[in-house]
Amino acid sequence: MLLVGFVVLVMAVAVLCIAEYSSLPGNVGRVLTQEEQAQVIADNSPLTDYVMLSPNADFPRDDDITKITIHHMAGNLSLEELGSRFSDRDRRASSNYAIDSDGNVALYVEEKNRAWTSSDRENDERAITIEVANDEADGDWHVSDAAYDALVELCVDICKRNGIVEFTYTGDESGTLTTHRMFNPDTICPGPYLNGKLPALAREVNARL
């Protein structure tokens, strides 16, 4: 009887796993053709330089996009390296976009889908999440000027396409600009340097909306 119960349990888990994988969009977790990549970029930010769509997401998101949430990579990863990490189902992590230290932009989860980024489902249902590379480790977790400038450009683009008419930084989760540390007391993400730039980021973005 115990053996039968164990077999039934294993079969149930297998069915759930198969259902989870079969529910993924066909363009997720693989290298896209040029035509597929062009279509994905057309449906998201035209600033995108690299695409590797992660399976670690909810398809689609349940809420309208009303926020942008900033994170740091806690390292100077390439877009390909971060994409490889986000392709690992065991990590259960992803972001919508990332920016490397040269200012290049990657798309890992399409905007219509919820990335698993901020330790808060409610926020991520409403937010486009962006990881920014650090060109210096520890300390202030500095980010390059190129990465910061690209962040401004990407935030402007996201706001314009999604009808965010005012980009507000309030220092808490009530603003349209939020950060990882607002939802997880155990992290300093996005680091002291970038966190200190957020009021200026909001002003620069608003000046262009």
Report each predicted region and the residues it spans.
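Basic/polar, cationic surfaces and motifs that engage anionic cell-wall
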Residues: 2-5, 17-44, 62, 139-209
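Cell-envelope and extracellular/periplasmic
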Residues: 128-137, 182
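Noncatalytic linker/hinge segments flanking ATPase motor cores
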Residues: 84, 106-116, 136-140, 168-175
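Feature marks short, surface-exposed loop/turn motifs that line or immediately flank catalytic pockets
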Residues: 76, 136, 185
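Soluble periplasmic/extracytoplasmic beta-strand elements of cell-envelope proteins
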Residues: 69, 129-131, 178
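Second-shell loop/turn segments in exported
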Residues: 56, 82, 94, 116, ...
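N-terminal catalytic cores of peptidoglycan-degrading enzymes
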Residues: 1-124
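Divalent metal-coordination and catalytic microenvironments
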Residues: 97, 130, 151
